[in-house]
């Protein structure tokens, strides 16, 4: 995902950093790809010039955690409980300009729920956003 989104990040002068543990989750590759792509794409779109997106992976026992943190524009507190709703856009003017449909985070939530995981989002207006996805780790490759 990082390599695919580098051109979009570069066009906005946003740096993507990847770190952490390697793990395998019980999920289809295409779903995990779509999940991470949606989150990172938002982190790039709603960032500032010279911004940063950090993708951190952690193997925490039976759970794989994917953290995506940005130092972008953030989300107002009153919108936090609605961002996973289909077609919800925090700033309709900016979202339209950015080509947003308001489906990205609802797709993320759906994928995570299908695989028995959780997704949380914390944000501060003007400071950035942290998205945390937790999914069950596959104990062996046949899972």
Indicate where each model-derived feature is located:
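Acidic ATP/Mg2+-coordinating residue in the GHKL
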Residues: 70
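Short conserved segment of the HATPase_c
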Residues: 75-89, 109
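Conserved micro-motifs of the catalytic ATP-binding
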Residues: 20, 24-31
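Short beta-strand/loop element within the Bergerat-fold HATPase_c
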Residues: 50-62
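Conserved glycine-rich
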Residues: 116-117
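Short helix-loop "hinge" at the ATP-lid/N-box region of the Bergerat-fold HATPase_c
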Residues: 43-44
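Glycine-rich G1-box
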Residues: 7, 73-74
């Amino acid at each position: 995902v990082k390599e695919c989104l580098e051109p979009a990040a570069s066009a906005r002068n946003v740096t993507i950093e990847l770190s952490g543990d390697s793990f395998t989750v019980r999920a289809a590759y295409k779903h995990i790809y779509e999940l991470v792509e949606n989150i990172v794409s938002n982190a790039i779109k709603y960032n500032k010039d010279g911004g940063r997106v950090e993708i951190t992976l952690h193997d925490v026992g039976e759970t794989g955690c994917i953290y995506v943190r940005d130092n972008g524009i953030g989300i107002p507190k009153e919108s936090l409980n609605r961002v996973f709703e289909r077609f919800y856009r925090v700033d309709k003017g900016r979202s339209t300009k950015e080509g947003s449909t308001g489906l990205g985070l609802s797709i993320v939530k759906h994928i995570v729920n299908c695989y028995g995981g959780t997704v949380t989002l914390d944000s501060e207006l003007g400071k950035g956003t942290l998205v945390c996805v937790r999914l069950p780790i596959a104990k062996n490759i046949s899972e």
